[in-house]
């Protein structure tokens, strides 16, 4: 966002099963929504969309995929980022069932539903025509799938500041802070960056690019 890129967030579940404090159960949904909004603000994002699915039980159902298709056709992004639909056995905590379901729902939406005018025809009738997503970037997946590393050294403090806002999800904030910074430095080394740099790691998939058979 610092470079002027327009960014939108889609939050699929309400996070109602998250957190660690029993006393917060009644207000956890509102608490997590507020944390998300503030964390997004820190990152320069104001366009948030909540799908209000149940935490821990997300499925890539016809209805959920339809919600994602509708949102994509409204926003028409050049790049879609999503959790990876494949389980990461190197660190299984990356592969929460909701993360896997999110990745699968987004994948089904990106291809073929969002570009198929006959999928969810009610959307086209409502003025949301089909369009082709150029790129899908996955994160949080198996390390061997990662093929693109982005240097974020100048933005690490902003990232960690935003993560810290999700206080209900971090029983040990300082340990989380150190863990994130270490992981980002490891990503940079894996990506061939200079020692001391930090990077995000992605599995980039071209959907409709010069290298793909667009529309086939």
Predicted regions located by residue number:
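Metal-dependent de-N-acetylase/amidase catalytic core
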Residues: 62-216
């Amino acid at each position: 966002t610092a470079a002027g890129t327009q960014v939108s967030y889609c939050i699929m579940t309400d996070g109602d099963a998250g957190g660690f404090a029993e006393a917060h159960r009644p207000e956890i949904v509102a608490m997590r929504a507020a944390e998300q909004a503030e964390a997004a603000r820190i990152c320069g994002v104001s366009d948030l969309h909540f799908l209000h699915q149940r935490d821990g039980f997300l499925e890539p159902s016809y209805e959920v995929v339809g919600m994602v298709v509708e949102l994509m056709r409204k926003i028409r992004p050049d790049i879609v980022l999503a959790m990876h639909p494949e389980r990461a056995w190197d660190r299984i905590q990356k592969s929460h069932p909701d993360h896997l379901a999110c990745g699968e729902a987004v994948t089904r939406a990106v291809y073929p539903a969002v570009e198929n005018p006959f999928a969810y025809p009610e959307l086209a009738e409502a003025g949301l025509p089909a369009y082709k997503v150029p790129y899908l970037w996955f994160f949080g997946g198996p390390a061997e799938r990662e093929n693109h590393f982005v240097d974020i050294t100048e933005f690490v403090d902003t990232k960690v500041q935003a993560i810290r806002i999700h206080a209900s999800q971090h029983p040990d904030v300082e340990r989380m802070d150190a863990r994130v910074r270490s992981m980002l430095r490891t990503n940079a080394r894996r990506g061939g960056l200079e020692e001391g740099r930090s990077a995000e790691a992605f599995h980039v998939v071209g959907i409709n690019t010069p290298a793909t058979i667009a529309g086939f």
